[in-house]
Regions:
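Expand to "…catalyze enediolate/carbanion chemistry for C-C bond making/breaking, isomerization
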Residues: 1-168
């Protein structure tokens, strides 16, 4: 998924990868993936991921769950609760659910005809909050977000920024 989609230049973003930091994180072994095959293990794996991200050599932990019985709303509520607890500890969690169609505008840079995953899965991405904020600010200054639909920007970047009040 990372090599075949996230790291490749994306025409909708001016041939910049969807995540400009993904290739380096993967190549440096700074990416950890925790697979969940039974949804009742999801909460424990997320907590395990919050421990793994504390390692200074880890940039991102992805908890991927293929047993999707949790709804988009339930996942978002769960992750919000975790963020209230973990953002003060410099840990940020972001949910990605395959059935989430929150955006009013299509997010073309997240759609591809070239590659499809073998199965559907939800993800929880876990990163250091301050490091993510700095990287996001650098990308903003370079114009990276200029091509993002406004509602997608609000649901990702502005949503993360709303947790700043818990950090300091």
């Amino acid at each position: 998924w990372s090599k075949n989609f996230i790291e490749k230049p994306n025409e909708y973003l001016g041939n910049v990868p969807v995540c400009p930091y993904a290739a380096k994180a993967r190549q440096d072994n700074a990416l950890k993936v925790l697979e969940v095959t039974k949804d009742y293990n999801l909460i424990d794996k997320i907590v395990e991921g919050t421990e793994l991200i504390k390692d200074s050599k880890t940039d991102i932990v992805i908890v991927a769950c293929s047993d999707i019985h949790i709804t988009v709303e339930e996942l978002n509520i769960l992750i919000h609760g975790y963020n209230v607890v973990f953002v003060p500890q410099d840990i940020y969690l972001m949910a990605s659910h395959p059935y989430d169609d929150e955006e009013d505008e299509p997010v073309e840079f997240l759609e591809t005809d070239d590659w499809e995953p073998d199965n559907e899965f939800l993800m929880v991405l876990i990163q250091n909050f301050d490091k993510l904020e700095r990287a996001s600010d650098m990308m903003r200054k370079k114009g990276y977000y200029d091509k993002w639909p406004l509602d997608y920007y609000d649901g990702t970047v502005n949503k993360r920024k709303s947790y700043r009040r818990y950090r300091h």
